[in-house]
């Protein structure tokens, strides 16, 4: 019998609510929904019911992984022609135009209907209580809310929902959101129809359209999540799992496939040799990401070929071990966005879940009286009509948020994730390498200094012409940095944007869970 249960997520209060659900007879799936609901209230800077959700679920009795894509689609009445005729070069970051259907609530019910044990009323009641009675705002959330407020103060209902008196909440202030409490009560009473049909859906659609947007009641009513098969590659005997596009998870698998051809262990963690090869592999994976990753309902994307060893062997020939590549083209495939949480229970079930509004709080669109902000994922469409990720009605945008999972010999090993936009697949690959190649434990793998490469080559357009920038977190040796510069890398120091990692590992023989949550963000590992 599995003795422990474990939850790792942002914020101690949210973690405690997970454990409460588990003690009252819930399982890892119930706990994940409870945690996500709590974080939507307590960390509106990263997620909420106005956003999307992705999950990978391990069901022990079936020895099977399930994948859930709960991302929403673009408005049916908004066309590419509208953007072109109005001279848009890209879709705006804020306002009504980047708003797509929020998929989170439907994702909750898909997870709950398939795997949940206790009633949704019991899952959401703690969050409803905290929304009514209030909770102390943490230092980090206070900081991010203040930063975000500059973008949103002129939008209707933002101050009424997220301000205390004349400003965003300060550290330690008790914040209440009674409107969100009422929205969650409606969801408890009427299920997902209470959100996607009826008064709430009408309020959302009417508000967005009043602000000049196109999201309609029918867009909300017709929304459906999709159960999908996770995809994997084997890295030195471990199967690493991600979800296929419209997300970016397979970039991590491409990076790992490319690096498997090198003796990473002998290079050593933090060496110029390792960092150089990692960055060059990342450039190749992200060149494909920029061109091919998009909604698979609109494109024939040979995912299995992109993550194959055969393709990696071809692309690895483009890596120069001595020099940084200034430009990288996507491969020829004709032959072939946040909070993260993870939960586990005494039955051996595990959930890897990530959820986000994109750009922190989202679009700035706060429908009156509902207590949440709508996401702005639509910003991540391209307006190039020849691009895989070109905008189209009823299409899912490219997504940055990705959950991950590792199995070994058909058994669960690690449920993990890492927040942070384009950092996510880079971070996933680094966590895997830290554990498998560099023999780090679960906590060390997250605490180790990270590498982040960035360039203009994105799924919305742009090209890398100068090799991009290599950002290194504090902790790397200066001699190694000089060697990287000699290889042609443009190296910068950066204190932020290296993601936020959390994980649960299971010792499958002894039936013991290990948890890890890093210091780059609020978060905790808790169990009973």
Task: Spell out what each predicted region is.
Residues 249-265, 406-414, 422-446:
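M16/insulysin-pitrilysin zinc metalloprotease superfamily fold
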Residues 227, 335-338, 399-401:
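Short, small/polar residue-rich loop motifs at catalytic or cofactor-binding pockets
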Residues 241-249, 342, 354-365, 418-425:
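Glycine-rich phosphate/pyrophosphate-binding beta-alpha loops
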Residues 15, 23-24, 28-190, 195-197, ...:
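Noncatalytic scaffold domains of N-terminal-nucleophile
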Residues 261-356, 369-370, 377, 495:
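Internal maturation/activation junctions in enzymes
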Residues 395, 428, 437-496:
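Extended C-terminal subregions enriched in glycine
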Residues 41-67, 214-216, 349-414, 438, ...:
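Active-site rim segments in enzyme catalytic domains, especially the processed small/beta chain
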Residues 1-14, 19:
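Single conserved hydrophobic/aromatic residue that forms the stacking wall/gate
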């Amino acid at each position: 019998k599995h003795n422990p249960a474990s939850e790792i997520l942002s914020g101690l209060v949210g973690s405690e609510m997970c454990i409460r659900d588990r003690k009252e007879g819930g399982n890892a799936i119930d706990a994940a929904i409870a945690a996500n609901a709590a974080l939507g209230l307590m960390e509106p800077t990263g997620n909420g019911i106005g956003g999307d959700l992705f999950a990978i679920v391990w069901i022990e009795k079936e020895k099977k992984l399930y994948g859930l894509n709960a991302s929403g689609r673009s408005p049916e009445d908004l066309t590419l022609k509208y953007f072109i005729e109005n001279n848009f070069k890209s879709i705006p970051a804020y306002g009504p135009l980047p708003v797509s259907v929020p998929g989170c609530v439907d994702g909750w019910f898909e997870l709950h209907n398939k795997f949940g044990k206790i009633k949704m009323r019991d899952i959401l009641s703690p969050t409803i209580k905290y929304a009514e009675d209030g909770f102390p705002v943490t230092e980090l959330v206070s900081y991010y809310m203040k930063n975000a407020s500059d973008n949103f103060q002129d939008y209707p209902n933002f101050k009424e929902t997220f301000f205390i008196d004349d400003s965003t909440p300060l550290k330690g202030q008790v914040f209440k959101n009674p409107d969100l409490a009422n929205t969650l009560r409606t969801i408890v009473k009427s299920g997902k129809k209470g959100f996607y049909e009826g008064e709430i859906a009408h309020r959302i659609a009417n508000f967005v359209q009043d602000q000049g947007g196109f999201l309609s009641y029918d867009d909300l009513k017709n929304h459906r999540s999709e159960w999908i098969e996770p995809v994997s590659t084997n890295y030195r005997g471990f199967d690493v799992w991600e979800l296929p596009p419209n997300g970016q998870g397979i970039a991590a698998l491409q990076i790992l496939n490319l690096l498997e051809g090198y003796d990473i262990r002998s290079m050593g963690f933090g060496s110029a040799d390792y960092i150089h090869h990692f960055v060059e592999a990342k450039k190749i994976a992200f060149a494909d990401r920029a061109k091919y990753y998009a909604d698979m309902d609109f494109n024939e994307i040979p995912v299995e070929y992109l993550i194959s060893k055969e393709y990696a062997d071809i692309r690895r020939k483009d890596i120069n071990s001595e020099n940084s590549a200034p430009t990288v083209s996507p491969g020829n495939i004709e032959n072939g966005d946040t909070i993260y949480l993870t939960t586990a229970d005494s039955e051996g079930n595990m959930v890897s879940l990530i959820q986000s509004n994109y750009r922190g709080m989202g679009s700035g669109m706060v429908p009156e009286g509902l207590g949440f902000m709508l996401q702005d994922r639509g910003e991540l469409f391209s307006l190039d009509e020849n691009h895989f990720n070109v905008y189209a009605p009823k299409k899912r945008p490219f997504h940055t948020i990705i959950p991950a999972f590792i199995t070994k010999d058909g058994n669960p090993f690690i449920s993990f994730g890492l927040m942070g936009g384009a950092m996510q697949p880079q971070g996933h690959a680094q966590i895997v390498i830290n554990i498998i190649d560099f023999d780090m434990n679960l906590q060390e793998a997250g605490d180790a200094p990270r590498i982040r490469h960035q360039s203009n080559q994105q799924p919305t357009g742009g090209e890398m012409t100068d090799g991009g920038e290599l950002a290194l977190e504090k902790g790397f040796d200066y001699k190694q940095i000089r060697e990287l510069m000699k290889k042609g890398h443009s190296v910068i120091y950066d204190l932020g944007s290296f993601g936020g990692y959390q994980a649960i590992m299971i010792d499958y023989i002894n039936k013991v869970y290990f948890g890890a949550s890093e210091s780059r963000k609020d978060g905790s590992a808790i169990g009973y």
